[in-house]
Amino acid sequence: MDETPIFFNMYPNKTIAKKGNKTILIKTQSQEKCRISVILCITADGEKLPPFLIFKAKEEGYIEKNLSELNLVKNKKCYITCNLNAWSTEKIILRWYKNIWRKYLESSESLCEGFGYLIMDKAPSHITEESLAIMKNDKNLISFIPAGLTRFIQPLDVSINKPFKDALKKEYINYCINMNEENLKITREKMIEFVCKVWYDENIITKR
């Protein structure tokens, strides 16, 4: 399991200009600093569990309630929540655990027979006493990746996050080209659609 930020503005970092130009104007969006966090998780046999999206908004406010009515959310293709900084907290990690990881262990798709082995980094929201107690009580063995080593031995950091974000960026750029609008803003609903489409695409990462 890992969390990764995703920005609403995913423009390419290159442009085309005449050789010798001293000034090059590049248009950007007003959303260039807007982001969400996504909690991703894959199993040892390549099963992709539903992504958990964290938006920047009031917790349990009208934005969260409206997003919860989307078909992708109601059909449990993904889960969403909100808080004021779009980062995970102990409460959010426990929601992820209860709605995604625990349900996977209890499902017929799981090969774990009720036991779980969870690998994650040592982010503050991952190592609270309450969350660890609940996870261990459910017969989970938990391994923490030491700080500074996630890019070497964290499976998602090493193999998944980059192709996922590259595919997400490609989806975003194609959408912007097809829309052909200046100052196009990506809605929260569209971001959910992007994330789910890319995550469940069997040609991008692992199997589904």
Which residues does each PLM region occupy?
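RecA-like helicase/translocase P-loop NTPase motor core
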Residues: M1-R208
